Swiss-Prot record:
The gene is ypfG. Pfam families: DUF1176. InterPro entries: DUF1176. It comes from the Bacteria. It comes from Escherichia coli (strain K12). The keyword Signal applies. Keywords: Signal. This is Uncharacterized protein YpfG. Residues 1-21 form the signal peptide.
C-alpha cells in the first residue's frame, strides 16, 4: 500500500524575471513530477507498483539529455531467485519488446539515454493502461504519464519545439531556454580549529543554562545538547526540544567560542515560495555533516523514511543558506532520503 503526504504539490507562481526556475512538484493520477531550480525534471510512477518503477529524467535546454529507467527494487531488494524483468514485461497484457540496441540491460534494471529510443518507447506506451510483469504482481500504471510528460514540456518551455515529448512543433531546439546559472554557496572556514576541552565544556554549560529557560515538551532528562566548531570563532549549538514517534525537533544557536559567550538563534529560510504560510523550516532530525560542513535536516513522513523532506544548509559566515532541498511526497517503499527528487540545488 502507498500513502501520500502533503508537501509541495505546486509552488506559487514566481516572476519570470528571476534567474532561477521556480521549483515545482505535481501529481498526475499515478505519476509524480518534480522539477528543480535548474529546470531538471524527473517523473516516476507511484500507485500500487509493488516495486516496479519507471523513472524518466530530463535536463533543461536544447540538448536532449534524458534518461529512462525501468527498475525492480525498492527499500527491500527482490528475492535472489526472481527472474529477469526484460523478458517478462507486458503492455496491457501483451509482450513488451525493447526495440533497438541502445538499452543497457541487467536482471532488475533497464536503462537507456538514447533520444530516439526514449521517444519511440514513450510513443508506444503513452496511450496504454499499465506495464506489468508476467508471473508477478508488479505494475507500472500509465494513468497520468501523458500529463506528466506534457508538464515537463511546459516547465522546460519545449511545447511547440522539435524536442517536445507531447506537443511537438517546428521550433528548433535552440528555441528552448537553457538551464539557469547554478548558484554557489561558498564554504566559509572549511577546516576550523577543533573545539578545545575548555571550549566544549563552556559551550555545554551554556547550553544547559539555555535549556533551563526553554519551553519544550521533551522531558528535560531526554534533552541533549550538541556542539560543534562552525568557524574559528563560532560554534553551532543544538538542543533537542520536541519529539514524536520518528521526528525530533531541535533548537539551534550560533555561539561565540570565546567568553563572554553570546548567541543568536539559527533560522532556516527557504529561498523560494513553498506554498506554506512560512518559508522557515524547523530543525527536524538535524545533524551536522563534518565532512561537507553542512547542516542536514530530515522531516520524515513516516518511520520507514521513504517519504518526507531532506535539506542541506551551508554556513556563509552570517547564516545558514540552502544548498540542497529534496522532497518525496509519496510513501510507497521505493527509496530513501538520499534518492528523493530535488527541488533546489547549488554548487
Amino acid at each position: 500500500m502507498r500513502y501520500r503526504i502533503f508537501l509541495l504539490f505546486f509552488f506559487a507562481l514566481l516572476p519570470t524575471s528571476l534567474v532561477w526556475a521556480a521549483p515545482a512538484q505535481r501529481a498526475f493520477s499515478d505519476w509524480q513530477v518534480t522539477c528543480n531550480n535548474q529546470n531538471f525534471c524527473v517523473a516516476r510512477n507511484t500507485g500500487d507498483h509493488n516495486g516496479l518503477v519507471m523513472t524518466l529524467s530530463r535536463s533543461a535546454g536544447a540538448h536532449t539529455d534524458a534518461v529512462l529507467r525501468i527498475e525492480r527494487g525498492g527499500l527491500k531488494s527482490p528475492e535472489a531467485s526472481e527472474g529477469e524483468i526484460a523478458p517478462r514485461l507486458l503492455l496491457d497484457g501483451e509482450p513488451l519488446a525493447l526495440s533497438g540496441d541502445k538499452w543497457r540491460i541487467s536482471p532488475w534494471l533497464l536503462v537507456t539515454d538514447d533520444t530516439a529510443t526514449i521517444t519511440a518507447f514513450l510513443q508506444m506506451i503513452q496511450e496504454g493502461k499499465a506495464i506489468t510483469l508476467r508471473d508477478g504482481d508488479q505494475t507500472i500504471s500509465l494513468s497520468g504519464l501523458k500529463a506528466a510528460l506534457l508538464f515537463i514540456d511546459a516547465q522546460q518551455k519545449r511545447v511547440g519545439s522539435e524536442t517536445a515529448w507531447i506537443k511537438k512543433g517546428d521550433e528548433p531546439p535552440l528555441s528552448v531556454p537553457p538551464a539557469p546559472a547554478l548558484k554557489e554557496v561558498a564554504v566559509v572556514n572549511p577546516t576550523p580549529t577543533p573545539l578545545s576541552l575548555e571550549e566544549r565544556n563552556d559551550l555545554l554549560d551554556y547550553g544547559n543554562w539555555r535549556m533551563n529557560g526553554l519551553r519544550c515538551s521533551l522531558d528535560p532528562l531526554r534533552r541533549e545538547v550538541n556542539v560543534t566548531a562552525l568557524t574559528d570563532d563560532k560554534a553551532l549549538m543544538m538542543i533537542s526540544c520536541e519529539a514524536g514517534a520518528y521526528n525530533t525537533i531541535d533548537l539551534a544557536w550560533i555561539v561565540s567560542r570565546k567568553k563572554p559567550l553570546a548567541s543568536r538563534p539559527v533560522r532556516l529560510r527557504l529561498p523560494f515560495n513553498n506554498g506554506q504560510e512560512t518559508n522557515e523550516l524547523e530543525l527536524m532530525n538535524a545533524t551536522f555533516d563534518e565532512k561537507s560542513r553542512e547542516l542536514v535536516t530530515l522531516a520524515k513522513g513516516r518511520g520507514l523514511s521513504d517519504c518526507g523532506i531532506q535539506a542541506r544548509w551551508r554556513f556563509d559566515g552570517q547564516r545558514f543558506r540552502l544548498v540542497r532541498y529534496a522532497a518525496e511526497p509519496t510513501c510507497d517503499n521505493w527509496h530513501g532520503p538520499d534518492a528523493w527528487p530535488t527541488l533546489w540545488i547549488t554548487r
